[in-house]
Structure formats: C-alpha cells, structure tokens
C-alpha cells in the first residue's frame, strides 16, 4: 500500500501534524507511522555548506594567495551532530512504499531551504512532492494546508532565492573575513592586546554595525545649541470669579516684529537670552519679577479654532513592530521576542511570526469571527470579543485598510488563532504579556477610531512699544470618544503609564476637561484675557537618540530612509536590511562577538571599542558593505529571484563580480599605517567604560612588534 510521508521542521511540529491527521500512529525511532502515512522531522538544519578545505586542503590555511575563493560548484554535507536523524529521514524519503512527500517545514524561505538540502543530499527521484503552506498550527489550518498543498515545483523560485542567500553569506563571509583578517587582523589584535582577532564580516551584519557606529559618532560630534522661549501665563474666566490658568508660547509668525529675524532659533525662540528679555521688556514685562508694567496694553483672543480629530486603530503586528513594542514596553530583546512569538505559534495561540505584513488576507477576513470568538475564553479581552460579536462589527472589516491581499507575500499579520488556551498556564509572564498585546492589537481593529475635540487659541498681546502685537499660542484637547483605546490598553499597565506610552513621540498638548472645553467654545474674538506674567524658558537642542533593540529592528526594516536618491529609494521600497526571520539573530550575533553592547535594562545599543575599530577597517577597505542602500538592494534582488523577475544566473553573476572585485581590491591595499591613528581617535571614548588595558598613544604605535601581514590574526 502506497504511503504519504509528511516531513516537518522539528519534532513538536511533527506531533501537531500527526494529531491533526488523526492516523493511528505508532512511534518509531525518529518518526511516526500508520498504515496510511509516515510523519518524520528535521531538527532544524540537517545539511550545511562545506568548509573550503573540503574542496582542497590548501584552503584550510588562511592565505591571501587562495583568495578569492569562489567554487564553480558548491559542496554540501550532513551536519555530524544530526547525522542519525538525517539518515532516518533520507531512508524514509527513499522508501519504495512512499509515493507522495508532503513538505511541512516552516512556510518561508529558510524552511524551504531546510527541506531542499535534505532532498538534495538524499538523492530522491520519482516521488510526488507537495508543499504544505500554513499560517498557524491549528488543526483546521494544518488540514487546509494538506488539502490545498501545491506541487513543490511551484516553490522553485523561492528555493533558488534561499540557495542564493546562503551562497551570498558564505562567499562574503569567507572571502571578506579572511581578506580583512589577513590584512588587518594583527593590527586589531595588537591594539587590543588580545591573543587573536578574527574580523567577522557579513552582508547584513556589517551594515547594521555601521548604522550603530554612525549614530554614535553623530552623538559625539553633536554640539548642543541653547535657545530661549518666551511664554505667557494667561487665564480664562470660568465664572464665579474663578479662573483657569494656561500657558501660551510666543512664536515669530507673520506680523511679528521678529518674523524672519536672524536673532531667532527657529520660530519659537531666540538664540540668545538677551533677545528674549528684549521681547519681554517691549511687551511690558518688568524683569526679573515677571510682573506686568503700565506699558502693557492687554491680551486679546485673536483666534479660536475648533477641530475634531480622529485616530484610527494601528495596523496589526508584523514581527518588526512586535519586536519594537516589546523592546519599548517590556525591555526584552528582539531575539527574545522572536522566541516568544515562535512559542505562541507552536502552542497554537497565534499565527506565523516571521511575517512582514501588517494586514489580513481577504480569505482570512471571511472567517475572522472564529478568531474573535475564541478570544471570549481569554479573560483580559473577553468582554471586548463578546461586544464585537454582538455588534457584528467584524462584518465590514474586508473593506478596511486592515485587509489587503496586495500587501501580503508569504504570510499575513500576527494575530491570535482563538485556540490553544490550554497552553496559557504554561506561559512565562513575559510570554503571557506578549500574547495579550497581540490579542489587544487584533481586537482593536474592530473598534471605531478615537475622537478628540481640539481647540487652538491665538492670543494677541499688545503694548505701547509693540502696538501691532505679538502672538502667543496654546492648544487644548479633550477625548470625546475612547474608541479602540480601551481594548488596546494592556491589563498589566496602569492607565497613567499606558497613557504615557500611547503619547510617546506625539506632540505635547494641553489636556482639559469637558467643562473647560465648553468655556473655550463660547469665547469670542477680541475678548480680553488676563496675562499675569511673561517668563523665559531655557532649552537646548538634543543629539540623536541611540538605537534601542526595537528601533534598530524597525530601522533595518525601513532601510529606504537612508537613501537620498528618490528613484533608488522607490526601487528598494519594501526591502529592508535582512528579513523578519534574520534581523534578531544578526543583532544577537553582533552582541555575542562583542562588536555591539546591549544594555538589558534599557535595551539601548552602543558599539564597543572593537566594533568601532572593525567599522574603521571595513570603511578603509570594503566601504560598500556599510551602505544600507547596497545591502537593501541585495535583499531586493533575492525577492526578485523568489518572484521570478530575476534569474539565479543573473544574481549569481552579480554576486561573483562583487566578491571577486572587492577581495582583489583589499589584497592590493597598503593602508595599514593609518589604522593606529584611527584607533587612537576612538579609544578615548571607551577607556572609562571598558576594562581593556589603557591604549598606547599614536606616537608609540610604530614601536609595536608586528607579525607578518599575511599571518592569521
């Protein structure tokens, strides 16, 4: 009897497939079997690319004479630690009674690569191969994936992109790391007084290092500029002799005596304090008490603008947005967030985590009531789920911005499945919090927008010296419809903290109650207002903020912001640095190899001395690796291969040329002498923070004993 073989990426996923398929299976060594089917698994990667010495023993020793290393045909081998499972899977794939293979590895580029390597090394022929592509591990989704499985050949372009990504990382890593280590490794090693220094380079990794170092250098070179704002303490009569105080800010708008003046710092302040004091004196203020003098003519309401504002629920989570929010709210790293998202996926609580999409597919939208219905069993959001179902507010979701098939490549956004609640008790506190924010973000799209009433006041202050008057501005806002805010506020935050998080990064405005709003709305143009005093508020410009782990992930996702050329920016739109599946791992590696430092309490990321030294080495030798535009264009090319718009041959030719040309350039360079000066220039910023020995000055650098240039560092 012919059998079906289901091959998953890991044992736990294989178990879920076995349960969903409902075959009476017996456990074997490395697989499960029934009369109708076999379910087996990989344990992640079973096959890897061979080291250079497998091609020829001469490549084992690092030497510039053997670079560039670009094999015509790439070699692969079974990973020794998992050889037993590979042999089991290989024998099953080749069993005579197996006629159809269902590929159930992760539904993405890397999952495709894992299986294709196994198939390649197992040397399979004459079998039907079907690809199971699913968005969650619920029973219904697994059965749908099996039922609708397509011929594996339809995923050949995706497999080609996966192979090319691996070849790219392999060739750039081996050639550039060896070339730079042989050329500059001793200089790095000697400067840091280490036993050895291997310079690790990668297409994405080095670019991310460059982003962090560039930001750090921007902060160092930033010169704070003081500025001085003038504010007025006004009042609004509330009746019964009571008054509501408010602060208005002066701005040099059109009509001001200081409009376009070179004395200004922007529109709302002065570069020097004396000029701010001059404004106050001319308006009738007596310094330093701030009391108004007889020269003051009055403050009059010139304009009262009323405006209704609404804010729609945010788009759903993709992995980058989830990692950013978890870094901000919980101070957990992107790598930890991905592990949690993967755990929630494997426990059937949420959908596939490694997604770039922030919307739903139209097909999912038709069945979305099932996901909502399941959340009635999740206490923190149960009432909201019930309300959505009772009011049928999900029925028109397909016509909103939250559903868009064109914005989905492999998977839709991360949402709750509405199932798997038996696993909730086993979740860690961090995992439970992440699940709750995913559930709340999902339910919020079925709620109306928040609506606020905003009132903007323009107050004209006149004096004998400034009869035309100077204008002060204030804004007030009151929330009139909560909309989605209630469901989006996590249960584990106080409302005060949540409000702070919600307003994070928004323009500051004065909030008010509805009684005050009603008074504001009745005020008329020309009405005189009390002005009790004027004052100067000193401020200073702020340097750029350091990246935190979440903001760095988002920046990697949106690499186009670094590109000034509009045409090029448009070309790589939608392609970031790395992918949703790899960004967290790249960041983790940079921290592990001590090129970057991650503060676990704040999630702030900074370069280390060694990381900044490596940046200088790369900048002096293979500078394009630091260019986000180039890195994003490589990723765009891989997307083109996956979509069938670029052939594997075209991409490989480009890769071959880049690696060959850049490696040969490094071999011809003789610029090592400038490195110590560059290292000395940055070392002072690290001596207090790092425990490395005090670094010698540039004048003594030449006295260091160096090994031969072509020795391994």
Enumerate the predicted regions with their spans.
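Basic, low-complexity terminal or inter-domain segments flanking catalytic cores
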Residues: 2-6, 28, 93, 99, ...
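Metal- or metallocofactor-binding catalytic centers and their adjacent structured scaffolds
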Residues: 260-315, 323
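C-terminal or mid-to-C-terminal helical accessory/interaction module adjacent to the motor/catalytic core
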Residues: 74, 96, 137-234, 307
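Intrinsically disordered, low-complexity regulatory segments
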Residues: 1-178, 543
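NTP-handling and nucleic-acid-processing catalytic cores
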Residues: 13-24, 40, 188, 194-233, ...
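Conserved short loop/turn motifs at secondary-structure junctions
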Residues: 2-3, 104-107, 197-198, 306-315, ...
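C-terminal helical "lid" subdomain and adjoining coupling/linker elements of P-loop NTPases
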Residues: 191-200, 212-276, 329, 353
